[in-house]
Amino acid sequence: MAADTRAKAVTLDLRRRLLSSSCRLFFPEDPVKIIRGQGQYLYDEQGREYLDCINNVAHVGHCHPTVVQAAHEQNLVLNTNSRYLHDNIVDYAQRLSETLPEQLSVFYFLNSGSEANDLALRLARQYTGHQDVVVLDHAYHGHLSSLIDISPYKFRNLGGQKEWVHVAPLPDTYRGPYREDHPNPAEAYANEVKHVISSAQQKGRKIAAFFAESLPSVSGQIIPPAGYFSQVAEHIHRAGGLFVADEIQVGFGRIGKHFWAFQLEGEDFVPDIVTMGKSIGNGHPVACMATTQAVSRAFEATGVEYFNTFGGNPVSCAVGLAVLDVLKTEQLQAHATNVGSFLLEHLTQQKAKHPIIGDVRGTGLFIGVDLIKDETLRTPATEEAEYLVSRLKENYILLSIDGPGKNILKFKPPMCFNVDNAQHVVAKLDDILTDMEEKVRSCETLRIKHPPEDTHPTQILLTRQQD
């Protein structure tokens, strides 16, 4: 039986029997079976079209013909490991170098963002001779054991915090200790990192690196205050550590204004290491780590060869080059600026209309909507967010939630997402929020629709917003 003709229930049963339940699905109560993608759209087994607002992996659009053709043509000729000379890997490194500050001139190619961050940790420790890492609260940097250790998002539910890991407050000016009314939140949050470093040093610890997503995503689509990372870098360098910018979810023009999100700090700010993944290959497993000559030479001085079987293979590099070509020829970075500004403006208008929307923030096609139960305490509207994304799915719009309170709507669509798509999403969001408010006024319990065979539908009892 062809997979695309197999009934959804059969596929789900096979998955439940053959795959671990820890490998979770979107919309677990009623998952979507996707069999085809094109541009910003996904299609299920019944041919229904969904607007994809989640998938920042299909960066230039699902199954972009230029990317597909590049992979196909290179596969017809050669795909082998990178120990042989080949033009693709050096051409790709050259093209990437043109997007980065000149100091970041050495490239390592890998297969996933997790591999890139793991290698960044190795290089930082080798260069500094130190062991410890400073990270932001609720951060996520990958699924390898080394990265779970530096990801509070994961380790708080597992073995806990290692003694060599030090957690600084998330620079969230909406929910954190230093908010929008603080005179200098960038300095205040950077001083928190300084205090974390000082506390570690008093215990005899030495800092190897500070890891942060240039715009924290899993943490809730956070936009750190301008100047924060520059000041953090000063504190980290003073402690003898390196600054690692994790661009895996936010790089390659997504923020519109710049190609890399760390460039929001200004042209004088240069991380010591930059890691890339997800969008870099438009769904093909490609990743990269860029660093300085000095850091790379320290790693080379160990005398231990670094080899990655599939990293930088001819097909992966052909795909990476094709993604860069599409970004340029279709002017998707400028497109992200224009469409993102439109979406941000219209979501902000919804904030004035619906009290459940506490904050709208973002840049380019990286946008978060913080849902609250009340304006004074800013209590996360966790259940309401779950209900909302379920209703959006019923309207063929795929959106996810994240953040410590699981109440942040995350907009990270393919870069071809357009103004018509933005208008459609905002209109549906408005309709559903209006309906939710009507149900609250009538004290009606909201229910997430489950498949017909589910006899225990999830119930969500909402409370009224404070006046």
From Swiss-Prot:
GO molecular function terms attached to this record: identical protein binding; lyase activity; pyridoxal phosphate binding; transaminase activity
Localization of this protein: Mitochondrion
Chief localization: mitochondrion
Pfam families membership: Aminotran_3 (PF00202)
Membrane-crossing segments per the record: none
Cofactors named for this entry: pyridoxal 5'-phosphate
Reactions this protein catalyses: (5R)-5-phosphooxy-L-lysine + H2O = (S)-2-amino-6-oxohexanoate + NH4(+) + phosphate
Residues with the N6-(pyridoxal phosphate)lysine modification: 278
Keyword terms of this UniProt record: Lyase, Mitochondrion, Pyridoxal phosphate
E.C. number(s) listed in UniProt: 4.2.3.134
Cystine connections: none
Annotated Gene Ontology cellular component terms: mitochondrion
Alphabetical list of PANTHER family matching this protein: 5-PHOSPHOHYDROXY-L-LYSINE PHOSPHO-LYASE (PTHR45688:SF6), PTHR45688
Similarity field: Belongs to the class-III pyridoxal-phosphate-dependent aminotransferase family.
The protein's role, per its UniProt record: Catalyzes the pyridoxal-phosphate-dependent breakdown of 5-phosphohydroxy-L-lysine, converting it to ammonia, inorganic phosphate and 2-aminoadipate semialdehyde.
Name listed for the protein in its UniProt record: 5-phosphohydroxy-L-lysine phospho-lyase
Upper lineage: Eukaryota, Metazoa, Chordata, Craniata, Vertebrata
Gene: Phykpl
